[in-house]
C-alpha cells in the first residue's frame, strides 16, 4: 500500500534539515544545486550530500484501509521507508520520515497487539562495543531512555518503541530478523513494556 503520512508543515525539523538523501556531490556541484534548486547540503565524509527534514509523523492517511486489509487476512506491506510525507491538504513535502516512528504510529493507529522492530542487531545493548557489553532482554521505556540518544541506528528504534509502549500500554520488541521467533519468546532481542 502506497502510504501517505501526514506531517506538520510547521515542524521544527524543516528549519534544520539533517537526513542525507541521494548521491554525493563535489563543492562545485553543491553551489550550482543550492542556487538552482534551493537544496541544503552537508558534508558526508569528503563529499557533500543533500539533506532534507525529518519531521515527526502525525497521521497515516491509509491506516483504515490497512486495518481492513489485515482484518480480511491479507499480508500488507506498507509505510515503506517511512512512507510518503504530505502536509496541509495532502501536498507532498520534501522530507524523510523515520521508518521506525512511522511503524510505531501505524501500530498505534490500527490498534496492533504489539510492535516489533527488526534489525541486524540482536538486541539493545548496554556498554555496546566494549568488553562489558550486555544484551538488555527486558526494560521499560524509562529504563531505555538513555539509549534513545545513542548515535547510529539504535537510537531512533528505541525512541519509536518507547513512545509506542508509553502511548498504547502494549509491548514492543527490538531484535534481529533472523531471530524473530526467539525475540518474541524472550530468548533474544529486547522486550520493552510497562
Residue ranges and their predicted role:
Residues 1-194:
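C-terminal catalytic "cap/lid" subdomain
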Amino acid at each position: 500500500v502506497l502510504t501517505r503520512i501526514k506531517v506538520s508543515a510547521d515542524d521544527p525539523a524543516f528549519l534544520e534539515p539533517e537526513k542525507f538523501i541521494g548521491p554525493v556531490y563535489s563543492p562545485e556541484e553543491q553551489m550550482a544545486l543550492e542556487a538552482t534548486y534551493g537544496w541544503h547540503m552537508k558534508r558526508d565524509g569528503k563529499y557533500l550530500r543533500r539533506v532534507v527534514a525529518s519531521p515527526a509523523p502525525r497521521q497515516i492517511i491509509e491506516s483504515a484501509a490497512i486495518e481492513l486489509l489485515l482484518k480480511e487476512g491479507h499480508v500488507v506491506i506498507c509505510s515503506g521507508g517511512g512512507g510518503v510525507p504530505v502536509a496541509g491538504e495532502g501536498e507532498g513535502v520534501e522530507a524523510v520520515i523515520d521508518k521506525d516512528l512511522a511503524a510505531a504510529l501505524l501500530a498505534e493507529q490500527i490498534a496492533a497487539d504489539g510492535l516489533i522492530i527488526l534489525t541486524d542487531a540482536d538486541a539493545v545493548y548496554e556498554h555496546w562495543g566494549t568488553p562489558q557489553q550486555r544484551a538488555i532482554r527486558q526494560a521499560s521505556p524509562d529504563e531505555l531512555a538513555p539509549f534513545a540518544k545513542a548515535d547510529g541506528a539504535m537510537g531512533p528504534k528505541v525512541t519509536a518503541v518507547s513512545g509506542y509502549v508509553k502511548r498504547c500500554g502494549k509491548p514492543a520488541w527490538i531484535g534481529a530478523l533472523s531471530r524473530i521467533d526467539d525475540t518474541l519468546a524472550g530468548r533474544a532481542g529486547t522486550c520493552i513494556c510497562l
